[in-house]
Amino acid sequence: GILRSMAVYVRSGGSTIQGGSTITQQLIKNVAFGGGMESSLGAKIKRKIQEQYLALQLEKVMDKKQILENYLNTINLGQNTLGVEAASERYFNKSVSELTLSEDAAIAAITQNPSKYNPITNPKDNASRRKKVLKKMLDLGYINQSEYDEALEDNLYDRIQIVNAQNESSASTSYFVDALTDEVVNDLVDQKGYTEAQAYQMLYSGGLTINSTQDSNIQTICEEEVNNNANYSDHVLYSFSYRLTVTKKDGTYQNYSEQTMLTYYQAQNPNYDINFSSQEECDQAIEQYKSEIMEEGDTIAEGGETITYTLQPQAAISVIDQATGHVVALVGGRGDKTASKTLNRATNITRQPGSCFKIIGCYAAALDAGGLTLASVQDDAPTSYANGTPLHNYDNRYRGFTTIRDAIISSMNVVTVKNLTQIGTGLGFEYAEALGISTLEPGDNNQTLCLGGLTHGVTDLELTASYATIANGGDYNKPVFYTQVLDHNGNVILDNTQNTSKEVLKDTTAWLLTNAMQDVITSGTGSGAGLSNMPTAAKTGTTTKNRDTVFAGYTPYYTAAVWGGYDDNTEQTYTAYAKLIWHSVMQRIHENLPRKEFTQPSGIVTAQVCKKSGKLAIEGVCDADPRGSMERDL
């Protein structure tokens, strides 16, 4: 069984494990010292001394077999499992006593490096290590040649993938918790020097107390509104994730998925997709696919077929307290979340932000350092990019001389590109990075930057944080999911309470952008999204063929951004749901909050300007123009 395999595996040096510690010391470290992940050399030395003393005492009351058995029940074996029994259930869905020799060796192979030799994520590396385990057992006489050959021929990795699919469909945590645990693990690695395996062990078995930033009421509201079909005006389709393992006549396995299905049918019809009007239609399509690919004598492996349905279009929302950077709520998808660590569309994918990026990639820089004001004018007329590609407004209309304020209100492409060209694309690129957009590539430093035409796009969370910077008077706060993490003794090991703000924009610039985006709500593309009891500022965004729809905005309390679209980038005929979700969420979370106003900084100056030139109006000339060519602006 597993004890025999593991004993052989660690046989070098008798009872010595990697790192020079005995098995007894390793057991003491795992049980008494939470895995021994101290951050300072002094603490490590102290722990080593205590380990050695306790190991001597333990060996007086337990024999080697008992110590080894206890050790095997505490070691990290990947996939957040501690001990061979947990690993056996996780990888093979059965007790350790039921494992075959082949399965024993696969688990034994994990011990040296649980991440590298994970049989789910790195099956080839595990197979190579497993072969060494079996060869060592053969050389030492624990198994014979026939047993060795039989174990090597066992294709157990398909079985592992089947069990993994079943496990993933039976456990679920919220999108917020997924993002929270990701942040804790990353910070343990980056700040404390842990390996990823050590960080996961600390997270799940180290007795940590994590103080999250989540507001449970806001989280519930976000989940309800993202999943409220009324917000989508009955535009509901279903896609699916599909896994099929077929046992062929010769005993080999063949794996299929929704991707192989898509490839199969698109070879016949390039426009074929896997979006259907009901789950029943999904099932019918799958049955048709199976009838075409399965041959006589093929059978579906036990537990070898899983289907997960996904509502389309999808949506995500992030809500941040701009004053602190605290993420108070986050939803990464629409529909039932059937497993932990599923695709989080708020944090783990990038999509094009569309016109929401006009503020981030152009106007923040233009007003802050480009020498322009909301009254600055460009001629909204047919033109082209520098490479000769024609440039159009979304409605193919042109309005002549137009101020920046009006360009923001009406989301005008031509005027925005002309303004970015005037200040230099490099300045817009620099400000976008300073506003927290980490996904930019050097190639994004071009005229399409201001329209959201990016190499990779942005995450919903980072877009929210960039708008939160404007809402916070120009000061950027890194978005965080926890305030503090404490160890089992109550000591603070990770601390976000000192989440230091960084000034990115002058407070006057932030206020000007806010003022213009308030007009977006009252008279522009964001009409209908205003709140009944709170001032709001926001910007809309859609991309080519409406593949993405985005709505980002804020109040004096909170900033939120909603993304919506099909997972496979299908064109959309209805895009208003991003604005509807944003409005519904923000209206509900502000219902009982005292009204606050956006505070105007002392440096703001107003003046009468000419709407055609953007220059100061000339008394006796502009005010005498019967067309009304003068307005008061900032």
Language-model segments: residues:
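Peptidoglycan glycan-strand catalytic modules in the bacterial/periplasmic cell-wall system
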Residues: 1-149, 164, 197-199, 334-336, ...
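Active/ligand-binding-proximal structured segments within catalytic/core domains
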Residues: 1-9, 340-364
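Conserved catalytic neighborhood of penicillin-recognizing serine enzymes
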Residues: 11-35, 164-169, 371-428, 488-519
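Active-site SXXK
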Residues: 137, 222, 324-325, 351-378, ...
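Non-catalytic structural connector segments
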Residues: 145-272
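A penicillin-recognizing enzyme superfamily signal
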Residues: 212-232, 238, 242, 246, ...
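Mid-domain, small-residue-enriched loop/turn segments at the edges of structured enzyme/sensor domains
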Residues: 389-393, 424-465
